[in-house]
Amino acid sequence: MALSDRENYLRTASMTGGEWIPMHIVVSGATWDQLREDLEEVLVHHPHFFPDFERGQRDYDAMQFHPQSRAGGEFVDNYGCVWHGEVDGIVGIVDGHPLEDWDALDGFEMPDPRTQLPLGPVDWDRIRQQMANRRQRGELLSAGTEHGFLFMRLYYLRGFENLMLDMATGEPRLQQLIDMIVEYTEYQVQQYLDMGVDVFGFAEDLGAQEKSVIGPRMFERWIAPAYTRLMQPCREQGVHIHNHTDGYVMDIIDQLIDCGVTICNIQDLIHGVETIRDELKGRACIDLDIDRQSVVPHGTPQEIEELIEYEVRTLGSPRGGLMMTIGIYPPTPPENIDAVLSAMRKYQRFWWE
């Protein structure tokens, strides 16, 4: 009897023998805005990944982006951080930092976790009902933090240069702020644990192009204890920890696993596929973030297929341990989107055929 999507995901994560590679496709709002009907023509030919998609579902004249993701838009989140959109369909930047001056900390009010997520309101009763409905349908129960829940939130609040100085000088108020953010996030984590989730995601970008942003020593001092505090209750209940981070993080990957991460969503070519194999394969499940800097946006369809095949052959196994994620952003042309979707479909069951 074939596995359900939920069973296959969990077996893949646990490396106990799945039947296909779980694959996740994210089409950015910017790509929708750029390609429109040309994108529709691609997606309609991939019902395996987009089973409910039909031409004409989107009204492009009425398409509106959240101010956070709209060129010229301004948005103040529940922490008081001010966001400005730069490009339609891509999340903007924070350039208003409510704790830029530490003197503001005494009067600073955290969001209320009972009613407020960082980016908007929350109705926990409604979410509980949604989770119950998903459980009844046999679906994977997944949840997670907002992107940028701790390290990035710190520089949203303080400003990047200020945060780097805080870490380097051992500013005592920094630990106070970290504890405040962790306490706020713990409430959210516990709500989902009480709902019986299968996997919980912690997402933020810890890496730059060639190395992690703060390095192993500063990560161990400032961030790892907070990660452990948030992740260990999940692990104690048998919940998988999915950790997304863009950028190079191989210099802190051991610490991430020690904190509790069981599924590492990391970028492929920044680290090198062979390095990922040598450092991670068999230790943690790899949710491979497929290149969106060179081959997929700028390569040929043949180069794209060769990349996907090589990654599946190198990192995959009949035991599982490999998932794949592709985020599609400009300037990826329609033919390359088609190529990456075709290749992902072609090699999804490579290890079981």
What residue spans do the PLM features occupy?
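Polar low-complexity intrinsically disordered regions enriched in Ser/Thr and small residues
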Residues: W32, D59, G92-D95, L99, ...
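A contiguous, low-structure linker/loop signature
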Residues: F65-L117, Q136-L140
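Active-site loop segments of alpha/beta catalytic cores
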Residues: M1-D33, V76, G85, M110-E353
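Segments that shape or occlude catalytic/ligand-binding pockets
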Residues: W32-Q68
